[in-house]
UniProtKB/Swiss-Prot annotation:
UniProt KW Electron transport keyword: no
Primary role: Catalyzes the reversible reaction in which hydroxymethyl group from 5,10-methylenetetrahydrofolate is transferred onto alpha-ketoisovalerate to form ketopantoate.
Protein name in UniProt: 3-methyl-2-oxobutanoate hydroxymethyltransferase
Enzyme Commission number(s) of this protein: 2.1.2.11
HAMAP family assigned: PanB
Species of the source: Yersinia enterocolitica serotype O:8 / biotype 1B (strain NCTC 13174 / 8081)
Similarity field: Belongs to the PanB family.
GO cellular component: cytoplasm
Entry annotation: catalytic residues: 181 (proton acceptor)
Entries under SUPFAM superfamilies matching the protein: Phosphoenolpyruvate/pyruvate domain (SSF51621)
Any one GO molecular function term: magnesium ion binding
Amino acid sequence: MKATTMSHLRQWKLEKRKFATLTAYDASFAQLFAEQGIEVLLVGDSLGMTLQGFDSTLPVTTADVAYHTRAVRRGAPHCLLLADMPFMSYATPEQTFANAAELMRAGANMVKLEGGSWLCDTVRMLAERAVPVCGHLGLTPQSVNIFGGYKVQGREEVAANQLLKDAQALENAGAQLLVLECVPVELAQRVTEALAIPVIGIGAGNVTDGQILVMHDALGITGGHTPKFSKNFLAQSAGDIRAAIKLYIQEVESGAYPAEEHTFQ
């Protein structure tokens, strides 16, 4: 089996072939997801909430993400594997490169960073040193204290225009992929069409090139508040996890998910 690479994702964008991605944190689930057809996985700092029980992603460390990245890589050796750089792990150039290198050594193919134009020097520095970068705009959970909670971003025209500029700046700085979270579908379409790099949405409508969900949301096992954009695919699959993942993939590829009920206007 051939490994999935960024060249595949770029080709899928050109072909307008939508693709489904998930978070994963251990070898068993990573293997199961890959066997059902998931080709891109993210070891997200969401592990702080889903696995460690915190109320935000802020306490997560690079060592935490590296630990789970090693496990996921062993379970899914052929998937394109992204790893989140946690809060304050890319504050200085030296710190950024050391932490990114740790995640790449753990098995990541790409690191994901949250932030806009101010992050361009960091993205450029990593790209020049052969570390592929995925950007993350919209609702960036590491900025929860600035946003005052988990809120939809880019609804006002000024904010929407700035987000588009940030996306283009990150692409120009060398980002190869972009995650767009909790933005109005119209803005998501503008960004997706403006960029040559693939855009993965979460709470951004069905207009992006790909979709991602936290695995716990896709399987309906999230405790507490459930995001509007989430869908319990397990409940629609008679409790069969494999069938649930296949259904998720099918609905993303067909454009059936996310539906209007999962989308912000």
